[in-house]
A protein has these predicted regions:
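Solvent-exposed loop/turn segments at secondary-structure junctions
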Residues: 1, 29-34, 59-64, 94-99, ...
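Serine-esterase "nucleophile elbow" of acetyl-processing enzymes
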Residues: 1-28, 40-49
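Oxyanion-hole/transition-state-stabilizing segment in secreted/luminal serine hydrolases
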Residues: 35-70
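Structural beta-sheet core signal
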Residues: 55, 90-92
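Charged helix-capping and loop-helix junction motifs
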Residues: 68-75, 105-109
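A short helix->loop->beta-strand "cap" motif at the edges of active sites that frequently abuts
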Residues: 81-89, 120
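Substrate-gating cap/lid alpha-helix
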Residues: 94-127
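Histidine-centered active-site loop/cap adjacent to the catalytic His
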Residues: 121, 138-171
């Protein structure tokens, strides 16, 4: 199961306990970046009156020029904030290398300051894993030399950190 599906299960359990229900929409489109998303926000997020958006472009924004990716990432955030009461949680799934072993820069370095400016909480999966383990622990979440697509254990780990973050807000 993907981290999104596992996070949905967590929400369903919380909703049951509180007598509520959730309407889960996974509006992510595989392989797309924030330049594509900025054109979809109105129809896919705001129109559907989402309560929470998990924003994750740490892999696919890499291919955009820096000025464009920063503007479009911020554009997605601004549209959500200006047109709805939707909460935003940013997710940074940091990548280390592509399938040929070439190191890739982390988008967290560019996206986190934008999130900080708008006071958007985030989960940095790699930072969370390394805080409690080692680089070898992080590498175990992949089955191939590329560290872009996590295995099932990786998805479970991502979901666990997201749910931990959300549980903290729920408990407040």
């Amino acid at each position: 199961k993907s981290w999104a599906a596992q996070t949905k299960n967590w929400f369903e359990n919380i909703a049951k306990k509180s007598g509520g229900k959730i309407n889960f929409l996974n509006e992510g489109v595989s392989g797309t970046d924030s330049a594509f998303a900025v054109a979809r926000v109105q129809d896919h997020i705001i129109k559907n009156k989402a309560d929470l958006v998990v924003l994750e472009f740490s892999v696919n924004d890499l291919w955009l020029e820096a000025a464009i990716r920063n503007k479009t990432y911020e554009g997605v955030i601004r549209q959500i904030m200006n047109n709805s009461e939707t909460a935003i949680l940013a997710l940074f799934i940091n990548i280390k290398c592509d399938d040929s072993g070439v190191e890739l820069p982390s988008q967290q370095k560019e996206q986190q300051p934008i999130c900080d400016y708008y006071q958007i909480p985030f989960v940095s999966w790699k930072d969370e894993v390394l805080a409690v383990g080692s680089a070898a622990d992080f590498e175990a979440f992949y089955d191939a030399p590329e560290t872009v697509h996590p295995n099932n254990a990786g998805h479970a780990s991502i979901a666990g950190f997201i749910c931990k973050k959300l549980q903290g807000y729920w408990d407040e």
